[in-house]
From Swiss-Prot:
NCBIfam families linked: mutS1, PRK05399.1
Name of the gene this protein is made from: mutS
Spans through the membrane: none
Assigned keywords, A-Z: ATP-binding, DNA damage, DNA repair, DNA-binding, Nucleotide-binding
Biological source species: Limosilactobacillus reuteri (strain DSM 20016)
Record Gene3D superfamilies: 1.10.1420.10, DNA repair protein MutS, domain I, MutS, connector domain, P-loop containing nucleotide triphosphate hydrolases
Protein name as it appears in the record: DNA mismatch repair protein MutS
Pfam families: MutS_I, MutS_II, MutS_III, MutS_IV, MutS_V
SUPFAM superfamilies: DNA repair protein MutS, domain I, DNA repair protein MutS, domain II, DNA repair protein MutS, domain III, P-loop containing nucleoside triphosphate hydrolases
Family of the protein in this entry: Belongs to the DNA mismatch repair MutS family.
Amino acid sequence: MAKKTTPMMEQYQKVKDQYPDAFLFYRLGDFYELFNDDAVKGAQLLELTLTTRNHSAKNPIPMCGVPHRAVNNYIDILIDKGYKVAICEQMEDPKKAKGMVKRAVTRLITPGTQMDLNGEQARDNNYLAAISGQNGVFSIAYTDLSTGELKTTSLNNANDAVNELVNLQSKEVVVDGELPVEITTQFKQRNILQSHQPTVLKNAEISYLTQDLDDQAQQHVVALLVSYLLTTQKRSLAHMQKAIAYQPSSFMKIDHYSKTNLELMRNMRSGKRQGTLAWLLDETKTAMGSRLLKRWIDRPLINQNAISERQDKVQELLDHYFERSNLQQELIKVYDLERLAGRVAYGSVNGRDLIQLKTSLKQVPKIKYVLETLDSPVFEELQKQLDPLDDVADLIDQSIIEEPPIAVTEGGVIKDGYNDQLDQYRDAMNNGKQWIVDLQEHERKLTGINNLKIGYNHVFGYYIEVTKVNLDKLPKDRYERKQTLVNAERFSTPELKEKEALIMGAQEKSTALEYDIFVKIREQVKGQITRLQKLAQQLAELDVLQSFAVVSEDYHFVRPEMNTGHVLKIKDGRHPVVEKFMGHQEYVPNDVLMGEDTDILLITGPNMSGKSTYMRQLALIAVMAQIGCFVPAKSAELPIFDQVFTRIGAADDLISGESTFMVEMMEANNALTHATDRSLILFDEIGRGTATYDGMALAQAIIEYVHQHVRAKTLFSTHYHELTALENSLARLKNVHVGATEKDGELVFLHKVSAGPADKSYGIHVAKLAGMPSSLLKRADTILQKLEQKDVKLPNTPKPATDNYHTEPISAKINEAAPVKKEAAPVVEDNGQLELFATQPEKKESSVDRRILHQLKELNLMGMTPMDVMNQIYKWQQKLK
């Protein structure tokens, strides 16, 4: 026998069947309800109380719900967890509905189409991407639905396609067919939602977006993306900008691993923004400026004229402090024009949004004046182009009250005097309400009941309320009973009914007319979307440039000189983020000198001495220079790098199950395969993840390969001191080292980079700083001394490679250079060699020592006088004797 269900649940199930992979938020009055499996899972994810519908039924239906005014908060939680949410609205007034209220899904919200972003997310782009592959070529399109940005490109292999999508930080990717496993695997590992769009619009249907595209594959992938948006959003996409095709090779290429290693956007410890280059450089005053800054960092320029143009503008703002301050004061009053324009076009804008838009537009004439006072040719064109959209600002100013409610369907948004018909309705409402007040006073005098009152509720409308003790004072045949309460009765009169009809009719008509007026205003503003978007882009760029000027002044950055050759000269360079965290401590600056005759700096020195920081600071200076910012140095001259490759730190790819050494080799191979003589390579401790001989052989072979064939500017740090001999055979390699010294038996890091190789590794000293047990350190020192006495050496390093790399792979050279495997033997024993695990007579730590150490650790120095401290030390001395 079929299971009985209500008409409403039948309606619900029909809608749910259309969106099986989404949470269905089903509108019932003032709540959105979830049913069945959605309710069970939703209650858990959203921490809601799970209840049931039809409690008395044999199989009650699980349900939970959220208030409609708070729904966005709950939607955000689900979207952040990677789910989709379908919003099913009531399509008619339940009071006027004949039978079942009509309902329909008005929007499908997905991780890539979320528009209502708050907090720090508001300063980030939320990109939805699409990918389509054919014959090994992959076309990608992406958009931020909240801003209308739309771009596309093509890539020649799957790895580059994945790298591009990862760099975009897309949470969702739309596909129209099968993709190579190396791409889909990355989607799964990075929790990127993969959405299928079976039907794709023809190019002719979206030619207004693709008219500037010549590539058919790019036209198709844009159509794929737009098709998905129309399917899920079910509304106008008028704010979508024309698709712009770009070539990744037109910008400095920084792969995902390198961006992670350099901490450009997210720090490696917590994944947060603090401690990154974007965090340091962000002195923007607008959300759209902050987003543009990140896009610039993500894609540094390689065109010298474009770099110089940005630098000229930064210089101008840097030289004019007062004008820059005035500019900041105006920019800080500008709201997020990009996303406001998006909400206008999308139909989700409210009265408060329009007031924010008006406030923002009112700042534009002031910004134009600031640029005019600069009287600079570099800002002359921008000053002329800035469009204050006076017509839009005046329209909003004349029509919308200054503090409108959020809801646009309940009235109270439009100013008095803007519409004659609306004013008439309001007059009827206001006069009618005054009539009610006068009627109450009249009825009190007529009946002699001083506490008689006239009230209103949604069920009974207007009523006259009289307490039961005063009922006998009411005139007969004039009062019609409407409701009985415990201590009172509610009545109506013919006069009250007549006025109620007039007031309620005016209020209902007023609310409906006001919404119609608001929609017309919204449509008028919508017609100026293109102008708004252009203004937003211009103000965002101006905001980033002033941000560069601020940080350049605050942190004493200098304007770098860019050359088209291969000369790299940095005087007193600094790591900008490390320097900021050091606060008042003095940062030790370092030079990087690599002329046309130097391609590789081989860096030696102890751990913790600053080798990695030295390498990172060069990469950050290069990125900063090529986004148009000034750089942390006394002076800087740099070539324009086409790519940056890094292998710094033990960034194990634990997600994909790769070891440190495997990731190291993959990243090294990526650099060796794709780097050019205009690239920058940073290799930190290559070869440390395998056996010593293998590691050293690989390190030397990589150095030689870069020297002979790649010729990129390369910083290569190593603990293989034997590699420093390569300076004698590789003409364009120079040794440098990070200094350290011993003082009273303690290791002191100098953090200064000097010419030549390091003379000592200080490994045991570093172990001491790490807190290794003292007995272990003594044993290590004994072993080291015996090794040094016997001059135990590693086998000879391989000979430098020659041009036969063209015919032999690197692996062949490594195998050739690797030592022949022999039977394992002790390194050194006491009769001429040392047994590594031999028992050595040494004093063990006593229980007294341990007690004293424990007491020392627990000592409250802040609560002791100098005499107390001396007495305690004297007691310890006596115990130790």
